[in-house]
């Protein structure tokens, strides 16, 4: 049994802007999670072309340890707490597959994302079979709703309800910001439709871990997109060439931080 959920994240940015904003924010967020031998290691970041699809391919290793629950940490052997993330970014469509060498085909997280210029109103954008779609839970993430943020994750400087962009004039986002977007002719909007498939086959732990993973994915999507909006002025003027240069520099920094910095970022047992 696999657990499927679709997360919809509406943002006051355009689909074109988001391409740059997402890559900028991924690079920055990676640094916040790396240190003490843990965090992100970038193995490959290169263009790809396959079956008529063109985009950017990345292969990363996440060294987790403190970022997985204690009950898994106690059962898993040394080295089993690394996960491999392979992503094919053929924007505006992106597919990410996360695996683990120890668990092989018994563990999978697949994230398929369509970025669309709408307010999250499309149904079955990933074109699943009607019978499969019927069982998918749809979850709306509101980046301005503080009640969706864990208190330990909250940072005032990353709160869209308080942030105002100097360069674009967007923000702060009030309680009805999504309804107001429709009438704001000068403010673009989009929705990231993220279909997440989770498979974890381990007798006695399957449901517990699959639910834990979805909880963490929702937490990641919420925190990440709050940051992305509140970092708007840092990335809105950047080009894709700027981003590629920044990614090269980030890879070097991550390698250094993993060795020299203390453990930091989200942990599972908070």
Curated annotation (Swiss-Prot):
Keywords: Acetylation, Cytoplasm, Lipid transport, Lipid-binding, Nucleus, Transport. CDD domains: SRPBCC_PITPNA-B_like. Belongs to the PtdIns transfer protein family. PI transfer class I subfamily. Catalyzes the transfer of phosphatidylinositol (PI) and phosphatidylcholine (PC) between membranes. Shows a preference for PI and PC containing shorter saturated or monosaturated acyl chains at the sn-1 and sn-2 positions. Preference order for PC is C16:1 > C16:0 > C18:1 > C18:0 > C20:4 and for PI is C16:1 > C16:0 > C18:1 > C18:0 > C20:4 > C20:3. This is Phosphatidylinositol transfer protein alpha isoform. A 1,2-diacyl-sn-glycero-3-phospho-(1D-myo-inositol) binds at residues 58, 60, 85, 89, 96, 194. Coiled coil: none annotated. It is found in: Cytoplasm; Nucleus. Gene3D superfamilies: 3.30.530.20. It catalyses: a 1,2-diacyl-sn-glycero-3-phosphocholine(in) = a 1,2-diacyl-sn-glycero-3-phosphocholine(out); a 1,2-diacyl-sn-glycero-3-phospho-(1D-myo-inositol)(in) = a 1,2-diacyl-sn-glycero-3-phospho-(1D-myo-inositol)(out). GO terms for cellular component: cytoplasm; nucleus. Phosphorylated by PKC in a calcium and phosphatidylserine-dependent manner. The modification N6-acetyllysine is found at residue 215. InterPro entries: PI_transfer (IPR001666), PI_transfer_N (IPR055261), START-like_dom_sf (IPR023393). GO terms for molecular function: phosphatidylcholine binding; phosphatidylcholine transfer activity; phosphatidylcholine transporter activity; phosphatidylinositol binding; phosphatidylinositol transfer activity.
């Amino acid at each position: 049994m696999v657990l499927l959920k679709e997360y919809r994240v509406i943002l006051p940015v355009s689909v074109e802007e988001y391409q740059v904003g997402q890559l900028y924010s991924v690079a920055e967020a990676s640094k916040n999670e790396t240190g003490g031998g843990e965090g992100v290691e970038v193995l490959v970041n290169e263009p790809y072309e396959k079956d008529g699809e063109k985009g950017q391919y990345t292969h990363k290793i996440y060294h987790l340890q403190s970022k997985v629950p204690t009950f898994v940490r106690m059962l898993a052997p040394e080295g089993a707490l690394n996960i491999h993330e392979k992503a094919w970014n053929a924007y505006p469509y992106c597919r990410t597959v996360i695996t683990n060498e120890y668990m092989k085909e018994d563990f999978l997280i697949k994230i398929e994302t369509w970025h669309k210029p709408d307010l999250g109103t499309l149904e079955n954008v990933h074109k699943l079979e009607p019978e499969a779609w019927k069982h998918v839970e749809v979850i709306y993430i509101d980046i301005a709703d503080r009640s969706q943020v864990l208190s330990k994750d909250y940072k005032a400087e990353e709160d869209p309800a308080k942030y105002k962009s100097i360069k674009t004039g967007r923000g702060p986002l009030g309680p009805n910001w999504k309804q107001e977007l429709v009438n704001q002719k000068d403010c673009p909007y989009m929705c990231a439709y993220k279909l997440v498939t989770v498979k974890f086959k381990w007798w006695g732990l399957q449901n517990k871990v699959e639910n834990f993973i979805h909880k963490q994915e929702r937490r990641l999507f919420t925190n990440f997109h709050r940051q992305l909006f509140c970092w708007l002025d840092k990335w809105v003027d950047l080009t894709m060439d700027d981003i590629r240069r920044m990614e090269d520099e980030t890879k070097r920094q991550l390698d250094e931080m993993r060795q020299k910095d203390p453990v930091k970022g989200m942990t599972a047992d908070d």
